[in-house]
Amino acid sequence: MGFFSYLGLVLVGLASLTSLASLANLQDFSTDNPLEEELRCWCQYVKNCRFCWACQDGFCKNKVLKNMPSVQEHSYPMEHCMIHRQCKYVRDGPIFQVECMMQTCDAIHLLNA
């Protein structure tokens, strides 16, 4: 086996490891239970996502935006981006982008159809 063939195999192996590491890094940005230090970023821009709210006795307070008034649980301002109560985040370079698959009003429309 020539030097360049061996080098090619090594590079393919490294590329595979890099892609696995990238997948592991994406799992760090979980939408189910984000890290406390990530909440400021997510909740600033995604005020409708469940993990941004602390609810008790039917009223919810935003965990990060302390000056935001409490809202009634399950009301429109508090509802989640997706009908399955999750938001999907896509890392696009240094920018995190939120993709909400189905807005609450669309979900209600489908349920009433």
Swiss-Prot record:
Q: Give the coiled coil ranges.
A: none
Q: State the signal peptide span.
A: 1-31
Report which superkingdom the organism of origin falls in. Answer: Viruses
Task: Give the UniProt keywords, A-Z.
Answer: Early protein, Signal
What induces or represses expression of this protein, per its UniProt record?
Expressed in the early phase of the viral replicative cycle.
Give the protein family.
Belongs to the asfivirus MGF 110 family.
**Annotated function:** Plays a role in virus cell tropism, and may be required for efficient virus replication in macrophages.
Q: What is this protein called?
A: Protein MGF 110-2L
The scientific name of the source species is African swine fever virus (isolate Pig/Kenya/KEN-50/1950) (ASFV)
